[in-house]
A protein has these predicted regions:
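Cross-family detector of peptidyl-prolyl cis-trans isomerase
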Residues: 1-166
Length: 166
């Protein structure tokens, strides 16, 4: 993740963007990706940002910095009703941003708009910290993680008058 800061500061990757975390001087880096066309995007909130307490629905894949998948959809893209796909449909996952999700998701997802797809690089202290995740050997302590997330729905959205923190 430190090398991402160097890339961002040097401006060598114009697609690399960042979000300043709420507390501290750290950043979470991300790139926008082309979203897959899906039937499960909630069109009434398309283009809106969720609140920090929203229950959101998303496709996601989590990998460690070696690219080893530990959770979420398989392959390069989620599958949503494509009968020609070589893998089964990817069920979207719903989760509460004010609940027990990693801090990096709580920081990044409220900056996303429903319908967007981001590749998010999260520093270890906003993931599973120094202890790692005991449910998998793929996330030892001090692991930075990468998440491919396509936001499909949010049960509460930011008001238009709220200033953006981007």
């Amino acid at each position: 993740i430190d090398s991402l800061a160097n890339v961002f500061e040097a401006g060598t990757d114009p697609l690399l963007l960042r979000i300043k975390v709420e507390q501290g001087n750290d950043y979470i880096y991300y790139k926008t990706k082309t979203p897959i066309t899906v039937n499960s995007v909630h069109t009434e909130v398309l283009g809106e940002k969720p609140t920090s307490t929203a229950v959101v629905k998303a496709f996601y894949k989590g990998t460690n910095i070696l690219g080893e998948r530990f959770d979420g959809f398989e392959g390069a893209d989620p599958v949503d009703g494509d009968s020609n796909a070589s893998q089964p449909d990817t069920p979207p996952v719903s989760f509460d941003l004010s609940g027990s999700v990693i801090e990096g998701w709580k920081e990044a997802i409220p900056h996303m708009k429903v319908g967007e797809r981001w590749l998010i690089y999260i520093p270890w202290k906003y993931c599973y910290g120094s202890t790692g995740n005991s449910n998998t050997t793929l996330i030892p302590g001090y692991s930075a993680l990468i998440f491919d997330i396509q936001l499909l729905d949010a049960d509460s959205i930011q008001k238009k008058s709220e200033p953006s923190k981007d």
